[in-house]
Amino acid sequence: LSKSLEQYKVSTEYLFTIKDSQTAVVIVSLDETGERSFNFYRHNTADLLLTSEHLNHIKWDELSTLHFCSNTLTNLAIANTTVSALKLAKNNHKLVSFDVNLRYSLWQNSNDIEHNVHACYAYCDIVKLSRDELNFLSEQTQQAPDDYLQSILDTGVKLVFLTDGPAPATVYHKAFILNESAPIINAVDT
């Protein structure tokens, strides 16, 4: 995997090898309408074994952005490492981007989802979520979806991108709301 990335000129400087661990695998399938489904194989995988000590090797002054998704919040140990990375990124004045990207089957306890996701907003500049994710998270907090969106902005997030399948995407900011249609495409691969 590392050699393949390097062949395509992808930096592997922060690719850590964790002894006696496996690589997570996801099989993505497309149905006849282009809708994706996922099968995850994630037992004793390196992504779950990353620790705050690994973060000490990051040269924050050479980076501009930290991007993450909720797959790094699915259990306590990796969630703690993620929050440590978020704190380091903010302390080093880096842009933090969060694609919520909920994959429910990865969570050990579904009751932790909203709490772990919401705990990250205070460190984020940009949040992206889908309409389905918004509906799920707002239900968990017994808020209307618009109120939940406002609660994200109230944490200091500057932009919230809301996607809704083929419907126009919406960008929320404290001062404006923008709707933008996406071009119609034929999904071949993801």
Residue ranges and their predicted role:
Residues L1-F68:
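Conserved N-terminal subdomain of the carbohydrate kinase-like
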Residues L55-N56, V117, A187:
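Acidic, amphipathic alpha-helical patches
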Residues I58-K59, A119-C120, L153:
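Structural alpha-helical scaffold elements that stabilize or flank donor/cofactor-binding regions
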Residues S70-Q150, P166-A169:
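Conserved beta-alpha-beta core of the PfkB/ribokinase-like small-molecule kinase fold
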Residues K87, Q142-T190:
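Conserved phosphate-binding/catalytic region of the ribokinase-like
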